[in-house]
Amino acid sequence: MIKPPLPLAQAAHWMTSFINPNNHALDGGRATSALELETIGALGSMVGYSKPLGHLTSGGTTANLEALWVARQSNTNTIVLANEHAHYTHSRMSEVLGIPFQAISSTENGAMNLLILRDVLEKLQCKGIKATIVATLGTTGMGAVDPLADILPTARAYGARIHVDAAYGGYFTLADLSKEVQRHFTAMDSADSIVIDPHKHGLQPYGCGAVLFKNPEEGRFYKHDSPYTYFTSDQLHLGEITLECSRAGAAAAALWATQQKFPYVRSGNFAQRLNESLEAAQGLKNTLIAQGWWVLEPELDICVFSLSGLKASEISAKNRMFFEQKAEENIHLALFSLSQQNCPWEMEWDVSSLTVVRSVLMKPEHNDPALWERIARI
């Protein structure tokens, strides 16, 4: 999952690094702090937040940590509920924060099972516990999209908080998604917090993540004093609303420059790059199906597929052999495990999971029929 950064972003990052600004306090990065606030405004507008509180982070792990920390600060008697395919960050950060964590089973397409979620919320309500629900828009393994638009009314009925992990998929809200998938992306504006990684599909060098809060009043949870900083100005110092202290201003400069070149608008040049990734996933899917492969329907730009067969163990072995064969051909794929509930194909389940092949089509050169043929060729 490494997308080439925009050369403009690399140049802005490189040039800014010569003055080495620190966006913790205004006296360490006055210009880049202003740029960071602009980048957060642009990200907020993209997801439908009118006046978001937020900042850049080193990546999605820290961004999700902060979102879960604010959730805990707003309700100390909470539990984190997330799709079983959610990024492992959530279970790890819940452990760090001392918050109970529970994985929610998924449906066949890898999205959170709404019926099971509702049952869990009902049981928690009987115990007087209000949950923090993590809805993932683009799981790392399958690119699955949790049904956010349907989770929201259920969550509100039980007094639950909603955090959206759109670290991988967030930018796709600008793309030409299917009507059903777009419905869930459009619902992001009703979430309490959102995480997006500009260093995934935002054309940024590593590391650049972002956390956004819909309610600016939640900045009160960050309130602290510092004997070393914050005394040079009555203006907001970004360090006052972050858990991280020192943060490179170069990341803000790079993202700001990219946003000037490619504004976040539907049907714009930036959105077209995302559409090419969607087209690549569909193109690979169709090529694989034509050659007899089993393929899951891609919701974003991640394609999961498998050779056919009779037994899960035999199919898994064939898929692993195919993976190794392609690596020798300089076609670098990945492996993933599917449980029976996530697998629509008929077979004998003589083992507990099926090893399948996974391809992330996030680079411009992936939208190429010749490449799809090379991947599908056995």
Residue ranges: model-predicted function:
Residues E108, T139, K261-P263, S308-K311, ...:
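A generic structural motif
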Residues L177-S178, H184-E299:
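Active-site C-terminal subdomain of aminotransferase-like
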Residues V181-Q182, C343-L354:
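Active-site-adjacent capping/gating segments
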Residues E276, L296-S306, L338-P344:
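A glycine-rich phosphate-binding loop feature that marks nucleotide/adenosyl-phosphate handling sites
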Residues W294-N330:
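Conserved PLP-binding catalytic core of the aspartate aminotransferase-like
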